[in-house]
Amino acid sequence: MILLAVLFLCFFSSYSASVKGHTTGLSLNNERLYKLTYSTEVFLDGGKGKLKDSVGYRISSDVDVVLLWRNPDGDDDQLIQVTITAVNVENVNQQRGEKSIFKGKTTPKIIGKDNLEALQRPVLLHLVRGKVKEFYSYENEPVGIENLKRGLASLFQMQLSSGTTNEVDISGDCKVTYQAQQDKVVKTKALDTCKIERSGFTTVNQVLGVSSKATSVTTYKIEDSFVTAVHAEETRDFSLNFLQAIAGKIVSKQKLELKTTEAGPRMVPGKQVAGVIKALDSKYTAIPIVGQVLQSACQGCPSLAEHWQSIRKHLEPENLSNAKAVSSFLAFIQHLRTARREEILQILKAEKKEVLPQLVDAVTSAQTPDSLEAILDFLDFKSDSSIVLQERFLYACGFASHPDEELLRALLSKFKGSFASNDIRETVMIIIGALVRKLCQNEGCKLKAVVEAKKLILGGLEKPEKKEDTTMYLLALKNALLPEGIPLLLKYAEAGEGPVSHLATTVLQRYDVSFITDEVKKTLNRIYHQNRKIHEKTVRTTAAAVILKSNPSYMDVKNILLSIGELPKEMNKYMLTFVRDILNFEMPSSKMIRRVLKEMVAHNYDRFSKSGSSSAYTGYIERSPHAASTYSLDMLYSGSGILRRSNLNVFQYLGKAGLHGSQVVIEAQGLESLIAATPDEGEENLDSYAGMSAILFDVQLRPVTFFNGYSDLMSKMLSASGDPVSVVKGLILLIDHSQDIQLQSGLKANMEIQGGLAIDISGSMEFSLWYRESKTRVKNRVAVVIDSAVTVDSSFVKAGLESRAETEAGLEFISTVQFSQYPFLVCMQMDRAEAPFRQFETKYERLSTGRGYVSRRRKESLVSGYELPLHQENSEMCNMVFPPQPESDNSGGWF
């Protein structure tokens, strides 16, 4: 009895998990003609758009299906013929009316006579247990037409029982899940698992990346082992991570309904399907059911030279602060990606020097084999006449959105050659480090060129050929962030000379917290507490910063807090404000600091009431539920009131992902003799020096020097013009996402998102002995444009959505120090300039014959300028440096 019950349960389970009457796939009746109607339609709109506002089109037809052959040895081995007839193309938006691009057009005019004939030629499907074993069509049919037939054919592939499996259809080799109910089957395709060859790339950094979501659900209604209705819907949503105004949605629907059945032809006799097909028509050939690449030809497009001439004026130096310059830059990159080496080289050789740097930016950013060959042929690294162009090329390589091994190999080859400028040689190595990191982030750490570059960087630090090369290799490691380089960094940080020691600690500062182990913190503690040797305060404060931001232990925090009060005055004040900043901004280590501060020995008035002008402050530029922009400003002075280091950082966060947008560090040393002041401990023998270093979008750039040595300082003070020194200037391709999508309906979708900016970061340091005042300025000016283009193409009609967001913005930091008294007066100001924000949206439908419909929208707003807040002490100091002017008395009179 128990055995019978178990057998019954097993039978009932298998029955309820499959459609009544069959256990595998669809089955056609002998000598019956199934007449169906079929439509595929596509909607395209912004991320939150409504279907009634969409652009798109519908292709509808009748479909005849007939069973041609069934294997005598098994019902689940069938050959069926599918024929499309009565094709029609129309709008999905019925409100288009007189504006419809199809109005007054016949189907042959819309599709093309040859295309229509090909579309209506029948295809054969060899179905085995419900799955397409072979797809037969005629050779040399247009790819777009074949894909439409593949999209229809894929609907006949299904199984009548529940379960998860892998299937090959027009979307590729995909994981699918079936849920079978009474007379109904629901198929869910996991589109993110589909394996299909398609071109595309994206930006590695998640903050600058694109999020997408894809779903596919097909519902079958079954009667007598054949479909009475099929409804399939595929959606593709995307948005730019940090600016969700750049978004879009594609909805693709397919509908197949059985209308009637009638008497059909007799089946073709035969034991093998190959013989049956040959008897039917020897011109039939087996082709993949996986969608093939549809190449979209550009009709009437200008040549590369014509395009360059049309945008050239927008890329002249005086126009680079405008958004139009960036949009022209992005459009030209797209054209360069289809250009040949000879075309590119011809334009480079013909251009004048004023616009050449911008042209070099564009050619390098194109990142194609032809563009790389052209720019390498054009630049001569042995010549000092094109140093600006060489530098622009190298920085564009560093900012490359999707670098490949070939680019790294090219730079390694250049590094082994000779250079007219040592600065360029150093820049090559620094950028090699940036490329190593990007390739490793994209699972390319084991590439031959990457392995070679890593050996070169680490070998240069282990045994540098020249002592001055140490800085170069440290800067390369600051970009590469190789975990195996940490022991070398610790060696240089603890035992190196002042500037080298400081640079090594700043490199450690860029590593992820997970790499700052207890062993690393032991060394950093020795540096901060000067257990083995005296260190400059720039080195000590950086070491403390790394410790306090890397999950410090109770004793790490306690020892640092106990040191406050015993340090040189300005370092004392800096460490005090740094700890307060961690607490105020609720950084991860704030909980541990609060725990230690409960001890009276660590938390007392004498320790935390020291005066000084140095400071550290962090604040928000913008904040939203899913993202945040922060800025931080650190100022460290010598005891005599002269700036030692200013450090301005901007970070962009998206969830747990972060992007180091920019860092501008101005450093000075050895200037005490100018005002007859006493240097701080450990800094008695420093040479006079001032310079600036920058990180831009996670890439460390080569530092620039204002002056080096006392004689250089005096000559520049006497001849100073007050003009700022440029750290980086140029056009950068920041966001770069390209994706070809095979829709299951047979249509081709393409998504392109590019974001670029024109940037100018400059800095200056003014020093007046007469007024006993110094002033430091850092200016950031940017124009930003983000372009998005999404298209759905059938080869004879195309729908598209184009979006653009643009702005021009500026951020200026000014630090004024008056050292005529002690404590000296320091005023820091951070001003964000007024910025316009413009958004554009264009939707269109266009026939291959040229007729089109276009809809445009525009929105513009103005973001007010404001001064970014710093700490209260700074506000009070600024009122003393720049006292409010008394109101003038306009009452008239002689006196």
Swiss-Prot record:
One of its GO terms (cellular component) is basolateral plasma membrane. GO terms for biological process: cholesterol homeostasis; lipoprotein metabolic process; phospholipid transport; plasma lipoprotein particle assembly; protein secretion; triglyceride transport. Coiled coil: none annotated. Residues 28-659 form the Vitellogenin domain. It catalyses: a 1,2-diacyl-sn-glycero-3-phosphocholine(in) = a 1,2-diacyl-sn-glycero-3-phosphocholine(out); a 1,2-diacyl-sn-glycero-3-phosphoethanolamine(in) = a 1,2-diacyl-sn-glycero-3-phosphoethanolamine(out); a cholesterol ester(in) = a cholesterol ester(out); a triacyl-sn-glycerol(in) = a triacyl-sn-glycerol(out). Keywords: Disulfide bond, Endoplasmic reticulum, Golgi apparatus, Lipid transport, Lipid-binding, Signal, Transport. Residues 1-18 form the signal peptide. GO terms for molecular function: ceramide 1-phosphate transfer activity; cholesterol transfer activity; lipid binding; phosphatidylcholine transfer activity; phosphatidylethanolamine transfer activity; phospholipid transfer activity; protein heterodimerization activity; triglyceride transfer activity. PROSITE patterns: VITELLOGENIN. Disulfide bonds join C174-C194. Catalyzes the transport of triglyceride, cholesteryl ester, and phospholipid between phospholipid surfaces. Required for the assembly and secretion of plasma lipoproteins that contain apolipoprotein B. May be involved in regulating cholesteryl ester biosynthesis in cells that produce lipoproteins. Heterodimer; heterodimerizes with the protein disulfide isomerase (P4HB/PDI). Interacts with APOB. Interacts with PRAP1. This is Microsomal triglyceride transfer protein large subunit. It comes from Mesocricetus auratus.
